[in-house]
Amino acid sequence: MTYEELKTTEINQLIVQTDLLKLAKECLSIVDSSTMKDKEITMLIESAIRDLERVEVDVKGHIEDNLVKNTIIIYVKAHFGDGDIDKRTEYLKRYKNNLRELQFSEEYQKKEVDSNAWC
Protein backbone atom coordinates (compact mmCIF):
# COMPACT_ATOMS: atom_id res chain seq x y z
CA MET A 1 0.00 0.00 0.00
CA THR A 2 1.41 3.39 -0.98
CA TYR A 3 1.63 6.35 1.37
CA GLU A 4 -1.21 8.12 -0.46
CA GLU A 5 -3.47 5.07 -0.20
CA LEU A 6 -2.67 4.73 3.48
CA LYS A 7 -3.35 8.43 4.07
CA THR A 8 -6.67 8.23 2.18
CA THR A 9 -7.71 5.18 4.21
CA GLU A 10 -6.77 6.95 7.44
CA ILE A 11 -8.79 10.05 6.49
CA ASN A 12 -11.80 7.95 5.44
CA GLN A 13 -11.74 6.16 8.81
CA LEU A 14 -11.63 9.55 10.52
CA ILE A 15 -14.66 10.71 8.51
CA VAL A 16 -16.65 7.60 9.49
CA GLN A 17 -15.61 7.67 13.17
CA THR A 18 -16.60 11.30 13.64
CA ASP A 19 -19.83 11.41 11.61
CA LEU A 20 -18.46 14.28 9.50
CA LEU A 21 -20.40 13.03 6.49
CA LYS A 22 -23.65 13.06 8.47
CA LEU A 23 -22.88 16.55 9.81
CA ALA A 24 -22.00 17.87 6.35
CA LYS A 25 -25.22 16.49 4.87
CA GLU A 26 -27.21 18.06 7.68
CA CYS A 27 -25.53 21.44 7.08
CA LEU A 28 -26.23 21.14 3.35
CA SER A 29 -29.90 20.32 4.08
CA ILE A 30 -29.57 16.81 2.63
CA VAL A 31 -31.50 14.05 4.39
CA ASP A 32 -29.24 11.47 6.02
CA SER A 33 -30.87 8.57 4.16
CA SER A 34 -29.97 10.05 0.77
CA THR A 35 -26.68 8.67 -0.56
CA MET A 36 -26.66 10.25 -4.02
CA LYS A 37 -24.07 12.93 -3.16
CA ASP A 38 -22.06 11.00 -0.54
CA LYS A 39 -19.01 10.52 -2.78
CA GLU A 40 -18.81 14.21 -3.63
CA ILE A 41 -19.28 15.28 0.00
CA THR A 42 -16.72 12.72 1.23
CA MET A 43 -14.24 13.95 -1.38
CA LEU A 44 -14.72 17.55 -0.18
CA ILE A 45 -14.31 16.56 3.48
CA GLU A 46 -11.10 14.72 2.57
CA SER A 47 -9.87 17.76 0.63
CA ALA A 48 -10.56 20.03 3.61
CA ILE A 49 -8.68 17.70 5.97
CA ARG A 50 -5.72 17.53 3.59
CA ASP A 51 -5.71 21.32 3.27
CA LEU A 52 -5.67 21.69 7.05
CA GLU A 53 -2.84 19.15 7.30
CA ARG A 54 -0.97 21.02 4.57
CA VAL A 55 -0.63 23.99 6.93
CA GLU A 56 0.39 21.69 9.81
CA VAL A 57 -2.94 21.70 11.68
CA ASP A 58 -3.30 18.58 13.85
CA VAL A 59 -6.69 17.54 12.50
CA LYS A 60 -6.62 14.03 13.96
CA GLY A 61 -5.80 15.34 17.43
CA HIS A 62 -8.52 18.01 17.31
CA ILE A 63 -11.21 16.38 15.15
CA GLU A 64 -13.83 16.74 17.90
CA ASP A 65 -13.06 20.46 18.28
CA ASN A 66 -15.90 22.62 16.96
CA LEU A 67 -13.56 25.09 15.24
CA VAL A 68 -11.96 22.27 13.25
CA LYS A 69 -15.35 20.74 12.38
CA ASN A 70 -16.74 24.14 11.44
CA THR A 71 -13.76 24.84 9.18
CA ILE A 72 -14.23 21.51 7.39
CA ILE A 73 -17.97 22.10 6.94
CA ILE A 74 -17.43 25.65 5.63
CA TYR A 75 -14.99 24.22 3.06
CA VAL A 76 -17.61 21.69 1.98
CA LYS A 77 -20.32 24.35 1.71
CA ALA A 78 -18.01 26.60 -0.33
CA HIS A 79 -17.23 23.87 -2.86
CA PHE A 80 -20.43 21.81 -3.01
CA GLY A 81 -22.57 22.02 -6.14
CA ASP A 82 -23.12 25.12 -8.22
CA GLY A 83 -24.77 27.33 -5.64
CA ASP A 84 -25.05 31.08 -5.27
CA ILE A 85 -21.68 32.67 -6.13
CA ASP A 86 -22.02 35.31 -3.40
CA LYS A 87 -22.59 32.64 -0.74
CA ARG A 88 -19.68 30.58 -2.07
CA THR A 89 -17.44 33.65 -1.92
CA GLU A 90 -18.52 34.32 1.67
CA TYR A 91 -17.90 30.69 2.67
CA LEU A 92 -14.44 30.76 1.08
CA LYS A 93 -13.63 33.98 2.94
CA ARG A 94 -14.78 32.42 6.23
CA TYR A 95 -12.82 29.24 5.47
CA LYS A 96 -9.61 31.18 4.82
CA ASN A 97 -10.09 33.14 8.06
CA ASN A 98 -10.62 29.95 10.06
CA LEU A 99 -7.68 28.29 8.32
CA ARG A 100 -5.43 31.20 9.23
CA GLU A 101 -6.60 31.12 12.87
CA LEU A 102 -5.90 27.39 13.11
CA GLN A 103 -2.61 27.67 11.26
CA PHE A 104 -1.16 30.28 13.60
CA SER A 105 -2.57 28.92 16.85
CA GLU A 106 -0.04 26.85 18.79
CA GLU A 107 -2.89 24.83 20.29
CA TYR A 108 -3.83 23.34 16.91
CA GLN A 109 -0.36 22.77 15.49
CA LYS A 110 1.12 19.32 15.02
CA LYS A 111 3.64 18.68 17.74
CA GLU A 112 7.12 18.10 16.42
CA VAL A 113 8.96 15.15 17.86
CA ASP A 114 12.62 15.80 18.49
CA SER A 115 14.32 12.56 17.51
CA ASN A 116 17.50 13.77 19.22
CA ALA A 117 15.84 14.27 22.62
CA TRP A 118 16.83 12.06 25.54
CA CYS A 119 14.03 10.32 27.36
Question: How would you label these PLM feature ranges?
Answer:
Residues 1-68, 101-119:
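Conserved short "hinge" loops at termini or chain/domain junctions
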Residues 59-84:
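Mid-chain, well-packed structural core segment of small domains
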Residues 82-100:
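C-terminal structural segments of small proteins and small subunits
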